[in-house]
Amino acid sequence: MAVLPGPLQLLGVLLTISLSSIRLIQAGAYYGIKPLPPQIPPQMPPQIPQYQPLGQQVPHMPLAKDGLAMGKEMPHLQYGKEYPHLPQYMKEIQPAPRMGKEAVPKKGKEIPLASLRGEQGPRGEPGPRGPPGPPGLPGHGIPGIKGKPGPQGYPGVGKPGMPGMPGKPGAMGMPGAKGEIGQKGEIGPMGIPGPQGPPGPHGLPGIGKPGGPGLPGQPGPKGDRGPKGLPGPQGLRGPKGDKGFGMPGAPGVKGPPGMHGPPGPVGLPGVGKPGVTGFPGPQGPLGKPGAPGEPGPQGPIGVPGVQGPPGIPGIGKPGQDGIPGQPGFPGGKGEQGLPGLPGPPGLPGIGKPGFPGPKGDRGMGGVPGALGPRGEKGPIGAPGIGGPPGEPGLPGIPGPMGPPGAIGFPGPKGEGGIVGPQGPPGPKGEPGLQGFPGKPGFLGEVGPPGMRGLPGPIGPKGEAGQKGVPGLPGVPGLLGPKGEPGIPGDQGLQGPPGIPGIGGPSGPIGPPGIPGPKGEPGLPGPPGFPGIGKPGVAGLHGPPGKPGALGPQGQPGLPGPPGPPGPPGPPAVMPPTPPPQGEYLPDMGLGIDGVKPPHAYGAKKGKNGGPAYEMPAFTAELTAPFPPVGAPVKFNKLLYNGRQNYNPQTGIFTCEVPGVYYFAYHVHCKGGNVWVALFKNNEPVMYTYDEYKKGFLDQASGSAVLLLRPGDRVFLQMPSEQAAGLYAGQYVHSSFSGYLLYPM
């Protein structure tokens, strides 16, 4: 009996291993059919099997490449019908030998040799891999414990799939919470007028101000005149009945006017909404023209006209030189000369706007104007009664593709939905795997129209439409708020000369210049003109004198009256044609002292052989404004320059012919005060000052008569920087002139 514990203990170990291996197989994942471990056939005598000693019951499993024992991996379970087919229990596995009466040796028998423990043999080589067994039956294991969630995977990179078929309209959901008031939308186009609804119940009398006059309605059809009924007898006044609920009756026949009742109490001020803005009235007549504006400033002096040709020289004998008479009185104003050529256009006048004219009489009522612009959208009215369910809306824009959900249970086959509109062609996908050919399905019936879906989101803003027809001119709006200062623009081109500005305040006169050195004593001047004395007071009558001696012979008497005309003389001899003006001048006669000047100052030979004199005279204009201060002003545009005594490059006139000269200058003032001086040999002999007023173009002029000797210089100059507003332009000329009155 001492031998029994070994085989029984070995049997229990084998059963435990078999059951544990079955549990392990049901709990893992399935990776395919693995070969069973090689079974070591028991070495049995005729009846008693031979077992290995305790501690080496488990056969050796060869290791795979990954370090795990072959056949010991956890099989992976798949979904569906992919459970591993394990061999049916107690059929394919060789049953262990039963330990019963057969394992116990009978009396008289010999003890099995397996009970005698021998030496451990050498480790054998692994046997060849056996053929795969038949698939086992699906296991029914206990679900394992839920594993921990794995680490978050990398974000998938996929291409957008094809748009899915439009789903069936869902059932009407519960009404959502009231959303916030959205922004005020744009005024939509005027809808088609709906059918006239039934008349509503008679409302309470409103308290409001009368609105504006409405548009005249269309005249209704003229009704038939009914027969005039007879007045019935007046009945007794019955008790006051309950308030009825009836429709307002037709208006009754107008009764006779009643007696004028007492005035009622003044009612409370009405509270009502302002009426609709009326249409703009007809345009009134034009007002009377305003009073004429003030005359603009005087334009610049025009260009002097062209001097006419000289007259034909007279024919006469030179008379004797008479005694120079006393200077006569100034002559009267001569007759008006011929008008000169029209000057260039003056500067535009600056006139102030006239006073508004009196209000004109009210004009006749005009034709009703065109329909005015559409008014602003009124306040939001009370919500109306819910209308009937509308037609199903258009399918909404497909939303973004959501994350893949868990695989659900296969649902029943749905009905065929409404064929949606053809979607836009998607991007070309990658070629997929070859699928199995499917069975052709049956065409489903068209389902009933679904409930009205929820309003879709507001679509994107459409593209700008075509430019519409310009609308009617609207009512001028109110003055808007002051805009933000804009970005300074680029510097523009220089504009045309502006209108002369107004003169500013007069500036201080600069200090006088440093007195120059004392000049050399001049030549003695010419004798003065004979004086004109007034007769004195008559003296007392003296006593008669003694008769005087015989006086000298008296002066010849006055010439007698002209005698009778003499006989006709010989035919006249015409002198040759004189040269053009400016080439020479005739003999200038006596000088200031009554003596003829010598013909030594530039005498020229005329075309007819006689002496000719060119007058020293000039007129020059300034073309550029604001010349430099402290230097002669260069009047650089010449109109006339006799004998070339004026140099336009320096602005200086140099005397060549001694005599008495007359100089004049005319200057314009703009942008500042102007102070000019007429210089003779670097000494100012005359000053002219003009004050500038902003917005006005002012002018100043001066003239002087100077006695010049050969070599004397005359010019204009501005002595101070504080008054240097000497201006000139294309149509605004500043000029400098001078000419010889008579030589010395």
Curated annotation (Swiss-Prot):
GO term, biological process aspect, one: camera-type eye morphogenesis
UniProt keyword list: Angiogenesis, Basement membrane, Cell adhesion, Collagen, Extracellular matrix, Hydroxylation, Repeat, Secreted, Signal
Extent of Pro residues compositional bias: 128-137, 558-581
Induction behaviour: Up-regulated during vascular injury, in atherosclerosis and in diabetes.
InterPro entries: C1q_dom (IPR001073), Collagen (IPR008160), Collagen/C1q_domain (IPR050392), Tumour_necrosis_fac-like_dom (IPR008983)
Region ranges (Triple-helical region (COL1)): 118-571
Post-translational modification remark: Prolines at the third position of the tripeptide repeating unit (G-X-Y) are hydroxylated in some or all of the chains.
Predominant location: secreted
Region (Nonhelical region (NC1)): 572-744
Signal peptide range in chain numbering: 1-27
One CC-aspect GO term: extracellular space
GO molecular function: extracellular matrix structural constituent conferring tensile strength
Biased composition (Low complexity): 168-178, 466-496, 538-556
SMART domains per UniProt: C1Q (SM00110)
Tissues with expression: Expressed primarily in the subendothelium of large blood vessels. Also expressed in arterioles and venules in muscle, heart, kidney, spleen, umbilical cord, liver and lung and is also found in connective tissue layers around hair follicles, around nerve bundles in muscle, in the dura of the optic nerve, in cornea and sclera, and in the perichondrium of cartilaginous tissues. In the kidney, expressed in mesangial cells, glomerular endothelial cells, and tubular epithelial cells. Also expressed in mast cells, and in astrocytes during the repair process. Expressed in Descemet's membrane.
Localisation per UniProt entry: Secreted, Extracellular space, Extracellular matrix, Basement membrane
Domain (C1q) ranges: 611-744
Nonhelical region (NC2) as annotated region, ranges: 29-117
Biased composition (Gly residues): 203-217, 328-337
Region of interest: Disordered: 115-393, 459-589
Additional note from the record: Four consecutive Gly-Pro-Pro triplets are present at the C-terminus of the triple-helical region. These may provide the high thermal stability of this region.
Subunit description: Homotrimers, or heterotrimers in association with alpha 2(VIII) type collagens. Four homotrimers can form a tetrahedron stabilized by central interacting C-terminal NC1 trimers.
Function in brief: Macromolecular component of the subendothelium. Major component of the Descemet's membrane (basement membrane) of corneal endothelial cells. Also a component of the endothelia of blood vessels. Necessary for migration and proliferation of vascular smooth muscle cells and thus, has a potential role in the maintenance of vessel wall integrity and structure, in particular in atherogenesis.
Name of this chain's protein: Collagen alpha-1(VIII) chain
Upper classification of the organism: Eukaryota, Metazoa, Chordata, Craniata, Vertebrata
